[in-house]
Amino acid sequence: MAGKSIFDKLWERHVITGQEGQPQLMYVDQHYIHEVTSPQAFQGLRDAGRKVRRPDLTFGTFDHNVPTVNIYDIRDVISKAQIDKLSENVKDFGIEHAAHGSELQGIVHMVGPETGKTQPGKFIVCGDSHTATHGAFGAIAFGIGTSEVEHVFATQTIWQVKPKKMLVKFTGVPPKGVYSKDFILALIARYGVAAGVGHVVEYAGDAIEHLTMEERMTICNMSIEFGSKMGIMNPDQKTYDYVQGRPGAPKDFEAAVADWKTLVSDPDAVYDKVIEIDVSQLAPMVTWGTNPSMGVEFGAAFPEIRDMNDERAYNYMDLSPGKKAEDIDLGYIFIGSCTNARLSDLQLAAKFVAGKHIAPNLTAIVVPGSRPVKRVAEKMGLDKIFMDAGFEWRDPGCSMCLGMNPDKVPDGVHCASTSNRNFEDRQGFGAKTHLCSPAMAAAAAIAGRFVDIRQLPEVQ
C-alpha cells in the first residue's frame, strides 16, 4: 500500500462525513477573519438568529482598509463602515481579535502565525485568497468566500472536495541574490498561473528545508498565483521553534510536537504531478506584465508577443518585447504585503539602502506587516535606516498591495513591489506593478531602476 502525503494525513483527520471524490464535510480548527469579507457573514447570522459556534477558534484583525499614515483617519465611507462593523461584530459575538490600533494589529496572515494560533496539523480557513500562507507550518489552509465564512461561523465546518496532489521539489543551493520570492516567481513564470488548478501543492526538497519559516511563508503565500488555493510544507524543527513560546502555542508542547512529527509525507507518498526545480540555476526575478507568470530573470529580454494576453499586457504596461527590466523607469517602491513584510524581509531590504538615498523623483514606502514586526524593527533601528534613505516608514496594513485604502500608485507610474499580484489597476487605477524580492525592490529604490543585485557588495 502506497504511503501518504502530509495532506492526505491531515485531510483524513478532519473529515466528518462524505465520500472521497464528492463534497466532504470538514472540521475547521482555526478561522481567521478581517473587515472586508466578514460583514455580510455576520449579518447572515443575525438574520437567522444564530451564534458563532466556536468563537474561541475564531480570530479577527483589521488590515485591508487600514490607512498606514494615520490609522484612525479613515476617509473612505465604505472602508470606515467595514472597520466599524468588524469592531461591533467581534464584540457582539465574543470573538478574540487584534483591535484596530492595538499592539497585535496587522495583516491577518502575519498575525495568525505571530500569535501562535497557526500550527502544524490544523485545518485553517479565512475569507482571503492568500490563506495558503499558513500551509508553511504543515497545515491545510485556504481562502473561502463570504457565504462559506458564514457557514464556518455557524457550524465550524466547511464542505470541500479533496483536490489532487502536486509535489514541487526545490533542490540545490540558490546563488547569492536569489531568495524565496524568486523561487515562487520562477515556478509561476515557467508553468503559468493555472498549473496548480485543482491541486494542493506540497513544496519540498532540500532548498525548502534550508529556508527559514518566514521564507517558507513567502512561497506558500503565492500558491494561489500558481492556481492552487492550498500550499503545504512538512513541519520540522524550525516550525516547532517558531511556534514555541507564543501565546497560542499548545500548553503541552512536547506532546504536540510528538504528534506533529507524525504529520510528514511518507517517502513513498504518491502524487498526481511532480515538478522539480534546481534553485542553483535561478536568478533574481522581475515581472513585466499583468499576471505573475509574466516574469523574467533579471537580464533577460521581455518575450515576443505570443497571444492577445501578451499584447494587452504590453499595452497596459507601456512596454515592448526585447526590453529588459533595467530599462524601466520606476516611480514608486513598495516593500510590504503578506508576502514580504516580515522582519527578515525588512532586514534584507535595509542592507541595500543603509547609508544611501533613494533616487530623485521617486516615492518609496516600507509598511511592516504587523505591529509586533514594526516594534522590533524600530528597536533594531531599521526605521531610521529607511527614513534616512528617504523612505516613508508606515504603520501596519495591507497598504499598497491593493487599491482598497489610501496607499495607491498613481496612474501610469511603474512600481517595484514585494507584493503578490500585478494585475491591471491592482495598486491603483493605471498603476504598473513589477513583482520582485525585497532585495530587488530596495536596490531599485536607490538606483531608480532595477539593477543586478548579484553584483552588489550587499550580497557578497
Swiss-Prot record:
MF terms in GO: 3-isopropylmalate dehydratase activity; 4 iron, 4 sulfur cluster binding; metal ion binding
Reactions catalysed according to its record: (2R,3S)-3-isopropylmalate = (2S)-2-isopropylmalate
UniProt key word Iron: yes
Pathway: Amino-acid biosynthesis; L-leucine biosynthesis; L-leucine from 3-methyl-2-oxobutanoate: step 2/4
Matches recorded under PROSITE patterns: ACONITASE_1, ACONITASE_2
Cofactor descriptive note: Binds 1 [4Fe-4S] cluster per subunit.
Keywords: 4Fe-4S, Amino-acid biosynthesis, Branched-chain amino acid biosynthesis, Iron, Iron-sulfur, Leucine biosynthesis, Lyase, Metal-binding
Keyword Lyase: yes
Family matches, as Pfam families: Aconitase
EC numbers for this chain: 4.2.1.33
Cofactor: [4Fe-4S] cluster
Chain sites annotated for binding [4Fe-4S] cluster: 338, 398, 401
UniProt record, GO biological process: L-leucine biosynthetic process
Top-level EC class as recorded in UniProt: lyase
Origin: domain of life: Bacteria
UniProt similarity note: Belongs to the aconitase/IPM isomerase family. LeuC type 1 subfamily.
PANTHER family xrefs: 3-ISOPROPYLMALATE DEHYDRATASE, HOMOACONITASE, MITOCHONDRIAL-RELATED
Quaternary structure and interacting proteins, as annotated: Heterodimer of LeuC and LeuD.
Name of the protein this chain belongs to: 3-isopropylmalate dehydratase large subunit
Species this chain originates from: Streptococcus gordonii (strain Challis / ATCC 35105 / BCRC 15272 / CH1 / DL1 / V288)
Encoding gene, per UniProt annotation: leuC
